[in-house]
């Protein structure tokens, strides 16, 4: 074999695999052109080596050939050339693999992060939803004998005996008719109730259960709470209206017309507050916050079936977690000023503090879009109607009626005390009156319409002069302001310097906050007694900025003028008179509605047993 042939066989390592040779034409050309003469210092076996060439014996020679295990030798220079061809390809291949691996790792990391984030979100949602369902545990603090008034725990003799309380002379003849204090049997029922409210339980004064109340944005804004106006800058709009009213700047009149797109300002942002308390539904009890509303008679709560978002924002009722739930399924629908509420009926235990009714038929609300943002972002989860049975939806009854029928409470009597005290915004007394909250006698007036808590009065007065001749008044805890016939409210507003603002609903008025402070209080005469409507309560701040007028706390409605109701303008829209009061059944005639602005200045007693409403002066 010639040296050239042996060289080809030598350098063609892994000749059975010609992949690399096929990939590199430079490598093939090197093999084809290789010869002994052109590549000096090529090594060979000893027998074929030229004896005259002794350079291979010199280890220091640059062309020295090192023997391999198979008897072949490696040529350093050629190996360097071949390495220079192989290495770049290896580098490129490794870089590509690294990039692919990096992409795979990055994608895997992203997927893991997304899955982990989704799991965390689901866990949070699950926790929030389940946080809404608070079990009721027995608490010794709720035992009525633990009250400072009724004696120490374990010493029932320390409380005033029932017989002694029954013999206590009444402060008023009508008080004798309505108040039969709690009996020993009632006290034992309350003390043995295994579902008594923990920590937020009631305070018992003279045998009367007193529940705390909290304030929130009003639910019923007399048909205006869902309607909005579009004003680029509402504050500037109101300031300009006040200036124009006072004649300070006529050029600002241009700001009151030709308004374009801007922020939607809901009218209810300027309403005062409404009051709510807590009830427990089911066994174990699930806490729900409800507005105590004398203008309606149903009890409805937000159902757990109303959607994930409302389950997060509200405390909902899940009948699947109640051991005392009984299905009914009858469709439910009620109309409020802002829109309808829909759902279905269910039966379960309902507890207001320690007063628990069994198998009470209530409504689970699942369609609450009609209430708009007033409910969506509100602090309440339902409505506890305290109105007359005739106002209730067919098949339902007021909570107080069920409580009396089940002997949970002896008297169908409840009382509102809306002055702040003891760190709360008000109190709701059940079953009687709290002698610590008022002075003098309770002045009663008979109810004249058994659909609403409506009484006859002598009308509104100012300095002894009659300024509103309408005498019928509805006492409604579900209304924040004082609402009356549009013509009478306009006359009173003009007399007091209040003014209307373009684009605002008809019947809504504003007034200078500073100038109105010098006005005198109004009076409402009921059964020969005058009760105040304070000017400071009629001034509702619309903005903290200087120069912004206050909302006047009286609103006018055509629907309250009597006769045939007609639609009323509301900024850009019109709302029908049917959206006046929740569940309105038939016309109510020429009437005023006295809301929280009036009730906060008096101790208000609702006595269904004797069909009367009582008023007393606040103690403090």
From Swiss-Prot:
<dbReference type="InterPro" id="IPR021109">
    <property type="entry name" value="Peptidase_aspartic_dom_sf"/>
</dbReference>
<keyword id="KW-0645">Protease</keyword>
<keyword id="KW-0064">Aspartyl protease</keyword>
<keyword id="KW-0472">Membrane</keyword>
<dbReference type="InterPro" id="IPR001461">
    <property type="entry name" value="Aspartic_peptidase_A1"/>
</dbReference>
<feature type="compositionally biased region" description="Polar residues">
    <location>
        <begin position="156"/>
        <end position="165"/>
    </location>
</feature>
<feature type="topological domain" description="Lumenal">
    <location>
        <begin position="132"/>
        <end position="620"/>
    </location>
</feature>
<feature type="topological domain" description="Cytoplasmic">
    <location>
        <begin position="1"/>
        <end position="110"/>
    </location>
</feature>
<feature type="region of interest" description="Important for proper cellular trafficking">
    <location>
        <begin position="27"/>
        <end position="31"/>
    </location>
</feature>
<feature type="domain" description="Peptidase A1">
    <location>
        <begin position="275"/>
        <end position="616"/>
    </location>
</feature>
<keyword id="KW-0812">Transmembrane</keyword>
<protein>
    <recommendedName>
        <fullName>Aspartic protease 1</fullName>
        <ecNumber>3.4.23.-</ecNumber>
    </recommendedName>
</protein>
<feature type="propeptide">
    <location>
        <begin position="1"/>
        <end position="258"/>
    </location>
</feature>
<feature type="transmembrane region" description="Helical; Signal-anchor for type II membrane protein">
    <location>
        <begin position="111"/>
        <end position="131"/>
    </location>
</feature>
<dbReference type="InterPro" id="IPR001969">
    <property type="entry name" value="Aspartic_peptidase_AS"/>
</dbReference>
<feature type="active site">
    <location>
        <position position="293"/>
    </location>
</feature>
<feature type="disulfide bond">
    <location>
        <begin position="513"/>
        <end position="550"/>
    </location>
</feature>
<feature type="region of interest" description="Disordered">
    <location>
        <begin position="138"/>
        <end position="174"/>
    </location>
</feature>
<keyword id="KW-1015">Disulfide bond</keyword>
<dbReference type="GO" id="GO:0005773">
    <property type="term" value="C:vacuole"/>
</dbReference>
<comment type="similarity">
    <text>Belongs to the peptidase A1 family.</text>
</comment>
<keyword id="KW-0735">Signal-anchor</keyword>
<dbReference type="InterPro" id="IPR033121">
    <property type="entry name" value="PEPTIDASE_A1"/>
</dbReference>
<dbReference type="Pfam" id="PF00026">
    <property type="entry name" value="Asp"/>
</dbReference>
<keyword id="KW-0926">Vacuole</keyword>
<feature type="active site">
    <location>
        <position position="476"/>
    </location>
</feature>
<comment type="function">
    <text>Aspartyl protease which is dispensable for protein degradation in the vacuolar compartment (VAC) or for tachyzoite and bradyzoite viability.</text>
</comment>
<dbReference type="GO" id="GO:0016020">
    <property type="term" value="C:membrane"/>
</dbReference>
<dbReference type="GO" id="GO:0006508">
    <property type="term" value="P:proteolysis"/>
</dbReference>
<dbReference type="GO" id="GO:0004190">
    <property type="term" value="F:aspartic-type endopeptidase activity"/>
</dbReference>
<keyword id="KW-0865">Zymogen</keyword>
<keyword id="KW-0378">Hydrolase</keyword>
<keyword id="KW-1133">Transmembrane helix</keyword>
């Amino acid at each position: 074999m010639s040296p050239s042939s042996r060289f080809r066989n030598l350098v063609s390592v892994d000749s059975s695999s010609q992949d690399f040779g096929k990939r590199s034409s430079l490598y093939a050309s090197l093999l084809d052109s290789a010869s002994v003469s052109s590549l000096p210092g090529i090594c060979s076996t000893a027998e074929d080596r030229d004896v005259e060439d002794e350079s291979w014996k010199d280890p220091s020679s640059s062309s020295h050939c090192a023997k391999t295990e198979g008897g072949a030798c490696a040529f350093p220079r050629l190996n360097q050339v071949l390495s220079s061809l192989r290495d770049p390809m290896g580098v490129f291949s490794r870089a590509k693999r690294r990039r692919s691996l990096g992409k795979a790792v990055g994608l895997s990391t992203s997927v893991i992060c997304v899955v982990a984030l989704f799991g965390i979100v689901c866990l949070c949602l699950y926790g929030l939803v389940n946080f809404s369902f608070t079990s009721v545990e027995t608490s010794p603090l709720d035992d009525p004998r633990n009250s400072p008034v009724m004696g120490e725990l374990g010493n029932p003799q320390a409380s005033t005996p029932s017989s002694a309380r029954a013999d206590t002379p009444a402060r008023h003849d009508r008080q004798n008719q309505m108040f039969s204090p709690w009996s020993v049997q009632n006290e034992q029922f309350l003390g043995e109730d295994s579902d008594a409210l923990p920590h937020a339980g009631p305070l018992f004064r003279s045998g009367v259960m007193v529940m705390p109340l909290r304030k929130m944005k009003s639910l019923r804004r007399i048909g205006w709470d869902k309607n909005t106006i579009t004003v680029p800058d509402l504050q500037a709009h109101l300031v300009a209206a006040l200036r124009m009213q006072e004649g300070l700047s006529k050029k600002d009149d241009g700001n009151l017309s030709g308004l374009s797109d801007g922020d939607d300002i809901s009218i209810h942002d300027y309403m005062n507050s409404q009051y709510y308390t807590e009830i427990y539904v089911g066994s174990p009890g699930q806490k729900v916050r409800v507005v105590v509303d004398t203008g309606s008679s149903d009890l409805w709560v937000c159902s757990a079936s109303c959607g994930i978002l409302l389950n997060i924002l509200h405390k909902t009722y899940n009948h699947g977690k109640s051991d005392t739930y009984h299905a009914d399924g009858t469709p439910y629908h009620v109309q409020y000023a802002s829109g309808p509420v829909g759902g279905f009926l269910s039966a379960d235990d309902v507890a207001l503090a320690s007063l628990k009714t069994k198998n009470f038929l209530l409504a689970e609300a699942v369609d609450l879009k009609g209430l708009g943002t007033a409910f969506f972002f509100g602090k309440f989860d339902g409505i506890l109607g305290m109105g007359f049975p005739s106002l209730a939806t067919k098949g339902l009854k007021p909570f107080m009626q069920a409580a009396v029928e089940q002997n949970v409470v002896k008297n169908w009597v409840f009382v509102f005390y809306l002055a702040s005290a003891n760190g709360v915004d008000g109190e709701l007394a059940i079953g009687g009156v709290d002698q610590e909250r008022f002075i003098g006698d309770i002045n009663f007036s008979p109810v004249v319409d058994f659909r609403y808590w409506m009484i006859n009065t002598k009308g509104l007065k100012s300095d002894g002069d009659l300024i509103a001749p309408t005498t019928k008044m509805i006492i409604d805890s579900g209304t924040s302001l004082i609402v009356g016939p549009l013509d009478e409210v306009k006359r009173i507003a003009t007399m007091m310097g209040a003014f209307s603002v373009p684009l605002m609903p008809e019947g809504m008025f504003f007034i200078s906050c500073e100038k109105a402070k010098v006005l005198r209080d109004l009076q409402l005469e009921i059964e020969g007694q005058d009760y105040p409507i304070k000017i400071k309560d009629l001034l509702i701040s619309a903005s903290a900025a200087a120069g912004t007028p206050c909302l006047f706390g009286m609103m006018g409605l055509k629907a309250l003028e009597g006769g045939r109701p007609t639609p009323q303008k509301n900024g850009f829209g019109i709302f029908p008179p049917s959206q006046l009061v929740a569940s309105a059944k038939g016309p109510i005639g020429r009437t005023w509605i006295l809301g929280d602005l009036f009730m906060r200045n008096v101790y208000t007693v609702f006595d269904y047993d004797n069909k009367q409403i009582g008023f007393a002066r606040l103690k403090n």
